[in-house]
């Protein structure tokens, strides 16, 4: 219990990203540009299409903004695609929070505007969830066929 309440060390920022049931928590601190997901470098994510999706915030903001910081991301829950979307949101939110706390407000606003213009879900979670199945049919909305004779 005490470990859960400890504050992160000075110079770090902790942010999370969510998509459906996937949750990614990113720890951002001064460093030399390393980004690791569950202990593995982000460059090794497979398949290729999902890796490109995870790289979006890095490519949008520019590698130069990431060269002085290290990010460690832990992701759990959901499927592969949901995890990637949670990771990209965690990266984007952590960069914005880091710039707000340790750099300056102007560059934070610039980065935030770049992300918001490209895709709002980089900064804001998608509220859609799976609708539960109901009786009288095979799914949430589909009904069994009705017969009058």
UniProtKB/Swiss-Prot annotation:
**Where does it primarily localize?**
cytoplasm
Q: Could you confirm whether the keyword GTP-binding appears in this record?
A: no
The molecular function terms in GO held by this entry are: RNA binding; structural constituent of ribosome
According to its UniProt entry, one GO biological process term is: translation
Q: Which Pfam families match?
A: Ribosomal_S9 (PF00380)
Keyword field: Cytoplasm, Ribonucleoprotein, Ribosomal protein
Which family does the record claim for this protein? Belongs to the universal ribosomal protein uS9 family.
The name of this protein is Small ribosomal subunit protein uS9
What organism does the UniProt record list as the source?
Oryza sativa subsp. indica (Rice)
Task: List the top taxonomic levels of the source.
Answer: Eukaryota, Viridiplantae, Streptophyta, Embryophyta, Tracheophyta
Name of encoding gene? RPS16A
